[in-house]
């Protein structure tokens, strides 16, 4: 099979925001510059449990904390890559991607719109049981155009789903370590930790989590290819990890019933080293689906700065 996808971003009215290429740096950033891009163009072949995909494509690994397509942005992140996936027996799954260019959300007119790269992305999934699984991963990211973003990460995730009476619960934990690779001029070794407990009863959900992106030698643990909008608040104040790293304590509440999907979350954000209180953020989203094709979404982010950045409110 094969696929081709083109996207176009057009601004309606006056853009009172910094889209990263319009020069309006006095406004908060909304990284959706106007333009037309070839988003995907690939061929794909599958035989039994083996699948290979060649060309420009989206790559989303797991929860997209390290590699994703940044689906919230109007122009998605894609990769010129070869990707191979296969099952190794009943319990193991192998996923490897090799890429030499990243097409980022900023579009072709931006100096940061494309990164020449040498990427090796390896995921190895192991299913212990229907309710439990591990993921082992190795990501080597070498960027010629952005050497300070070059890094090599090795880590493991664990996920378990269970029930306690009428409550379904899900535990997610992750540990990783990161160091310099390729063009990176800095020597560092930073760690990553994440734990989240999610509870669901009927139409209500609650989640409690604590995530740490550590720091070493003045370099914060970085995830330049992640779907970053999903993490550390919708205001996007932490797209680049500060030199002191980040601690993110968070509470999320949700309600899903029929056509409605409502969520609220609160983040306590501070440095991983140095005891710096960055600020707090409150996020809200309300979505209504008319059918399988049409929906509306209201979304709000309010970042209350303490010792990093400035107070910011965004509404979509």
Cite the ranges covered by each PLM segment:
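Well-ordered mid-protein domain cores that form the structural environment of catalytic cofactors
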Residues: 33-69, 73
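Short acidic, glycine/Ser/Thr-rich loop/turn "cap" segments at secondary-structure junctions
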Residues: 24-28, 62-70, 77-79
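Flexible internal linker/loop segments at domain or repeat junctions
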Residues: 219-244
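Signature for the C-terminal beta-barrel architecture of outer-membrane proteins
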Residues: 2, 48-52, 70-218, 249-251, ...
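Short, well-ordered beta-to-alpha junction loops that form the rim of enzyme active sites
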Residues: 7, 55-57, 267
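Transmembrane beta-barrel domains of Gram-negative outer membranes and organellar outer membranes
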Residues: 1-49, 80, 90-91, 250-254, ...
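Extracellular/periplasm-exposed beta-strand and loop segments of Gram-negative cell-envelope proteins
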Residues: 17-19, 28-33, 160, 175, ...
């Amino acid at each position: 099979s094969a696929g081709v996808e083109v996207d176009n971003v057009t601004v309606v009215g006056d853009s009172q925001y910094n889209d990263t290429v319009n020069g309006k740096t006095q406004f908060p950033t909304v990284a959706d510059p106007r333009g037309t891009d070839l988003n995907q163009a690939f061929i794909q072949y599958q035989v039994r449990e083996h699948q290979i995909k060649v060309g420009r494509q989206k790559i989303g690994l797991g929860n997209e904390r390290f590699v994703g397509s940044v689906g919230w942005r109007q122009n998605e992140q894609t990769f010129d890559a070869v990707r191979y996936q296969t099952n190794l027996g009943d319990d193991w799954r192998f996923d490897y991607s090799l890429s030499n260019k990243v097409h980022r959300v900023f579009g072709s007119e931006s100096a940061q719109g494309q990164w020449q790269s040498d990427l090796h992305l390896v995921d190895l999934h192991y299913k212990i049981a229907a309710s439990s699984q591990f993921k082992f991963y190795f990501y080597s990211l070498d960027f010629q155009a952005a050497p300070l973003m070059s890094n090599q990460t090795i880590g493991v995730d664990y996920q378990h789903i269970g029930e306690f009476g009428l409550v379904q619960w899900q535990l997610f934990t992750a540990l990783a370590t990161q160091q310099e690779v390729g063009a990176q001029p800095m020597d560092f070794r930073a760690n990553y930790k994440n734990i989240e407990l999610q509870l669901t009863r009927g139409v209500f959900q609650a989640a409690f989590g604590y995530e740490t992106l550590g720091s070493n030698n003045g370099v914060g643990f970085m995830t330049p290819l992640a779907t970053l909008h999903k993490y550390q608040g919708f205001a996007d104040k932490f797209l680049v990890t500060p030199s002191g790293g980040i601690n993110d304590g968070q509470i999320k509440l949700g309600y899903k019933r029929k056509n409605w999907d409502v969520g609220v979350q609160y983040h306590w954000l501070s440095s991983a080293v140095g005891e710096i209180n960055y600020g707090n953020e409150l996020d809200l989203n309300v979505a209504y689906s008319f059918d399988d094709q049409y929906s509306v979404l209201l979304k709000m982010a309010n970042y209350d700065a303490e010792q990093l950045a400035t107070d910011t409110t965004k509404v979509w």
